Amino acid sequence: MEAIGIHLNNIYKTFLHRVKGEVKAVNNVNLNIEHAKLVTLLGPSGCGKTTTLIMVAGFEQPDKGTIFLGEENVTNLLANKRNIGFVFQNYALFPHLSIYENVAYGLKVQKIPPQEEKQRVNEILAMVGLIGYEAQFPHQVSGGEQQRVALARAIVIRPKVLLLDEPLSNLDAKLRVHTRSEIRRLQQSLNMTSIYVTHDQEEAMAISDRIAIMNKGKIIQVGTAEELYFQPNSEFVAKFIGRINTLPAEVQEVDSGFVIVKIFNHAYKIPTTSDGIKPQQKINVFIRPEFIQLSKKVEENELKGIITEKVFLGEKVEFTVDVYGCTLNITSYNAVEYAKYLLNQEVGICLPGKELKFFKKKGD
């Protein structure tokens, strides 16, 4: 299949809400997706990710902006002229058609000759592991198998791009993990440019070449899973991707390559650009749970805390620690620490300065 890029330029979409009035569902979205890459739109409910997807599909028109599939401007092109494969959240299978007929539906619309139709349907059914299911109907197969039928129907037409709107939301947790791996395998083997929509951060991190974080109709940050996790550009992204702790701090000293902050009367040197940060400024500092280190003895350069909860999760242990009224979540991948530390035990808390982050607030 020929892979093409997808380019969204200054996309706006407003809907009229009977209570809220005009709602900006999509607000100046710009996104470039390279050919054969899978990009996920990730964000909370109502952030504009599905609206963006259906505008790429042609089911809605943007109020402003342009959509390109490769070199072709498809902004005003009808959905059925765009040659796009779409996998719906509820699969949208035809209940009165067999599995074979569901998968072949798009080929019949395209008036593909019967012999070629049969060859292409069988080829796709083999790829998704549904050989032998041809005569069955949607209600006779499992949710995971229905999802694979929907995926097969979307890709059998050899679309320019593949769009997936929360395709795993109706599956149980274990099946979601297996099915997302299958989707990724197919997408890569077919070199198919794809946009995937989900609110599940783990799903997005597992399946994507890049992730576009959305909130309130805007794209906040685009990057790989690693970039978003380790280098978030805002408090919103830091909190949305993975777990993170928030600590109150005060700026003590500002230099060109670092900032010294005070957290509960302990000083920490944070390597960072310091634009707009001033001494005595109150800020929030953030750190991931796995970067915090516990010790049995409270050293001079450590915070003092009390363990209020501990949970054994096999390969890791989760601790909840009270630090001067502030709750910290701490993850240890050394399972023996579950027995090492007791509930209500006083512990030392080491915060590595290089793992601390802070973000300028708007208007600062």
Give short role names for the model-derived ranges.
Residues A57:
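Helix-to-loop junction immediately C-terminal to a conserved catalytic motif
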Residues A79-G85, Q89, L93-K239:
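ABC ATPase nucleotide-binding domains
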